[in-house]
Curated annotation (Swiss-Prot):
<protein>
    <recommendedName>
        <fullName>Small ribosomal subunit protein uS5</fullName>
    </recommendedName>
</protein>
<dbReference type="InterPro" id="IPR005712">
    <property type="entry name" value="Ribosomal_uS5_bac-type"/>
</dbReference>
<feature type="domain" description="S5 DRBM">
    <location>
        <begin position="16"/>
        <end position="79"/>
    </location>
</feature>
<keyword id="KW-0699">rRNA-binding</keyword>
<dbReference type="GO" id="GO:0019843">
    <property type="term" value="F:rRNA binding"/>
</dbReference>
<comment type="function">
    <text>With S4 and S12 plays an important role in translational accuracy.</text>
</comment>
<keyword id="KW-0689">Ribosomal protein</keyword>
<keyword id="KW-0687">Ribonucleoprotein</keyword>
<dbReference type="GO" id="GO:0015935">
    <property type="term" value="C:small ribosomal subunit"/>
</dbReference>
<dbReference type="GO" id="GO:0003735">
    <property type="term" value="F:structural constituent of ribosome"/>
</dbReference>
<comment type="function">
    <text>Located at the back of the 30S subunit body where it stabilizes the conformation of the head with respect to the body.</text>
</comment>
<dbReference type="InterPro" id="IPR000851">
    <property type="entry name" value="Ribosomal_uS5"/>
</dbReference>
<dbReference type="InterPro" id="IPR014721">
    <property type="entry name" value="Ribsml_uS5_D2-typ_fold_subgr"/>
</dbReference>
<dbReference type="Pfam" id="PF00333">
    <property type="entry name" value="Ribosomal_S5"/>
</dbReference>
<dbReference type="InterPro" id="IPR020568">
    <property type="entry name" value="Ribosomal_Su5_D2-typ_SF"/>
</dbReference>
<dbReference type="Pfam" id="PF03719">
    <property type="entry name" value="Ribosomal_S5_C"/>
</dbReference>
<dbReference type="InterPro" id="IPR013810">
    <property type="entry name" value="Ribosomal_uS5_N"/>
</dbReference>
Length: 173
């Protein structure tokens, strides 16, 4: 009896793009010596406002990447974009020693972000954004800080409700 080891993909998984953020070789010291394995961090997105991150661990990089992609697909979140090109409002978030500042930008600015933050915005579908990493630039903590920022962002409807205005007044600023 053979077992199919291929990852299962759903119909919507075909239009997802994935980027490898980091690969780390970790070791566990056992009685016979060191046992090496790999830890992989991947971001996955549909380039239309949905993005997810996942981490996979395995003895081989390819298997770790498959695990990471599956984990990323499971925890995808929706990010509200203005005109499908930038963030609706500026946001700051912190995770461990990493702090990220994400700012919306004018048309033609591009993705001004360093390291692992750029990968998130590329798979998210953002064209104009400015991002700054303050503190630790460890890829894992920076990615989790960015996702914390995305989760704290408000939709235009929520912003309009807080301000007591119409959604069209909030969007057309």
């Amino acid at each position: 009896m053979s077992v199919d080891r291929k990852p299962r993909t759903s119909n919507d998984a075909h239009d997802l793009s994935e980027l490898l953020v980091s690969v780390r070789r970790v070791s566990k010291v056992v009685k016979g010596g060191r046992r090496f394995s790999f830890s992989v961090l991947v971001v996955v997105g549909d380039e239309k406002g949905r993005v997810g991150c996942g981490m996979g661990k395995h003895a081989e990089v390819a298997e770790a990447k498959i695990k990471a992609v599956n984990a990323a697909k499971k925890n995808m979140i929706r990010v509200y974009l203005r005109e499908s090109r930038t963030l609706h409002h500026d946001v700051t978030a912190k995770f461990c020693a990493s702090r990220v500042i994400l700012r919306s930008a004018k048309v033609g600015t591009g993705i001004i972000a360093g390291g692992s933050v750029r990968a998130v915005f590329e798979v998210l579908g953002v064209q104009d954004v400015v991002a700054k990493i303050v503190g630790s630039s460890n890829a894992h903590t920076v990615i989790y800080a960015v996702f914390s920022a995305f989760k704290s962002m408000l939709s235009p409807k929520q912003v309009a409700g807080k301000r007591g205005k119409k959604v069209c007044d909030v969007i057309n600023r």
